[in-house]
């Protein structure tokens, strides 16, 4: 799980 702007994980 990489930290993306749309993803919190």
UniProtKB/Swiss-Prot annotation:
UniProt keyword list: Pyrrolidone carboxylic acid, Secreted
Tissues expressed in: Expressed by the venom gland.
Positions carrying Pyrrolidone carboxylic acid: 1
Transmembrane segments annotated in the record for this chain: none
Annotated localization: Secreted
Chief location: secreted
A GO-annotated cellular component: extracellular region
Family: Belongs to the tachykinin family.
Protein name stated in the entry: Tachykinin-like peptide-V
Organism encoding this protein: Phoneutria nigriventer
């Amino acid at each position: 799980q990489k930290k993306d702007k749309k993803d919190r994980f």
